[in-house]
A protein has these predicted regions:
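Short acidic-glycine loop/turn motifs at beta-strand connectors
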Residues: 16, 53-58, 103, 124-126
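Conserved NTP phosphate-binding and transfer environment spanning the P-loop NTPase/kinase superfamily
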Residues: 97-182
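A short, structural micro-pattern
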Residues: 7, 92-94, 125
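Short, acidic/polar N-cap/turn motifs at the starts of alpha helices
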Residues: 9-12, 49, 118
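Glycine-rich phosphate-binding P-loop
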Residues: 16-44
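Conserved nucleotide-sensing/catalytic segment adjacent to the nucleotide-binding pocket
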Residues: 43-101
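Solvent-exposed alpha-helical segments within well-ordered globular domains of core cellular machineries
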Residues: 11, 35-36, 143, 147
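P-loop NTPase nucleotide-binding/switch module
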Residues: 1-17
Length: 182
């Protein structure tokens, strides 16, 4: 099967066996988020440039060989992760299952607060779920990414927090009105 290839500026991390493509403008904190996730036991596939290959209906990412296993942290420099954390914190390629786009938080910027419908982003003809996360000083973007992955996995099992609250509200309204909500 022919591979369709492209590349993007970002980082690819495996979180709970789920490939997370971190996107956002230069300097937003993608590499710092990746470092936080690595320190929590997750695995780096690529930092800075992510090569993307389509294999059937799946996407697989990797780093260009020259920068494979490196993480660039402003103020520290280039970190070669196998030397610092051991070979278990890196992988030469991994799946891309979820896109987390980091955007600067500021007054007036709106973020999804219900999560009923997941936005999508296309890469190499494959539609991926997209979560837009606020990156702000002293914020824990890594925690938001982990929560996004857990939510993604829960959605794959057929349930969302929005559906739970909707069911609870419908039940409450039915109880108060004496009949089911239509």
């Amino acid at each position: 099967m022919e591979e369709i290839k492209t590349q993007t500026h970002g980082a690819l991390i495996e979180v709970l066996d789920t490939g997370v493509l971190l996107l956002g403008r230069s300097g937003i904190g993608k590499s710092e988020c990746a470092l936080d996730l690595i320190q929590r036991g997750h695995v780096l596939v690529a930092d800075d440039r992510v090569k993307i290959a389509r294999r059937g209906d799946r996407l697989v990412g990797s780093a260009p060989e020259m920068i494979r296993y490196f993480l660039e942290i402003r103020g520290i420099g280039l970190l070669y992760l196998p030397d610092l954390y051991g070979p278990e914190v890196v992988r030469s390629e991994g799946p891309i299952d979820l896109v987390c786009r980091l955007v600067e938080w500021s007054e007036g910027v709106t973020f999804d607060r219900i999560g009923a419908q997941r936005a999508r982003e296309m890469f190499a003809g494959v539609s991926l779920p997209l979560v837009t996360l606020p990156a702000r000083p002293a914020g824990s973007v890594a925690t938001l990414v982990e929560a996004s992955v857990r939510d993604h996995l829960q959605r794959a099992r057929g349930a969302t927090g929005a559906e739970r609250i909707d069911a609870a509200l419908r039940a409450l309204q039915a109880e108060r009105s004496g009949g089911p909500l239509r």
